[in-house]
């Protein structure tokens, strides 16, 4: 499990990105890069790092399911992810 502070930081960055999204789009469309540089650093969407929704693990993240490979495997074995079954050939 990730540190609680890292999970909280990721949520804070996501909120900041959402808060400044419209303003960033307007400034980029106008080409006002000086004003864009004055916005908070965390307002840029490139600062978002995807994390597992269950435990906050930052690595081995599967976008389609919003889980890390470890939690995906566990939930898939338990049959809790619809449409996912173990391969057999």
UniProtKB/Swiss-Prot annotation:
GO biological process, one term: translation
Transmembrane segments: none
Cellular component terms (Gene Ontology): cytoplasm; small ribosomal subunit
Assigned keywords, A-Z: Ribonucleoprotein, Ribosomal protein, RNA-binding, rRNA-binding
GO molecular function: rRNA binding; structural constituent of ribosome
Annotated function: Binds 16S rRNA, required for the assembly of 30S particles and may also be responsible for determining the conformation of the 16S rRNA at the A site.
Assembly and oligomerization: Part of the 30S ribosomal subunit. Contacts proteins S3 and S10.
Family: Belongs to the universal ribosomal protein uS14 family.
Listed NCBIfam families: PRK08881.1
Name of the protein this chain belongs to: Small ribosomal subunit protein uS14A
Organism: Levilactobacillus brevis (strain ATCC 367 / BCRC 12310 / CIP 105137 / JCM 1170 / LMG 11437 / NCIMB 947 / NCTC 947) (Lactobacillus brevis)
Gene: rpsN
């Amino acid at each position: 499990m990730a540190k609680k502070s890292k999970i909280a930081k990721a949520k804070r960055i996501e909120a900041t990105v959402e808060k400044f999204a419209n303003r960033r789009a307007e400034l980029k469309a106008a080409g006002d890069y000086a004003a864009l540089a004055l916005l908070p650093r965390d307002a840029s969407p490139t600062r978002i790092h995807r994390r597992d929704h269950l435990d906050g693990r930052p690595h081995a993240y599967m976008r389609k399911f919003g889980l890390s490979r470890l939690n995906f495997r566990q939930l898939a074995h338990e049959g809790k992810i619809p449409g996912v079954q173990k391969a057999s050939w």
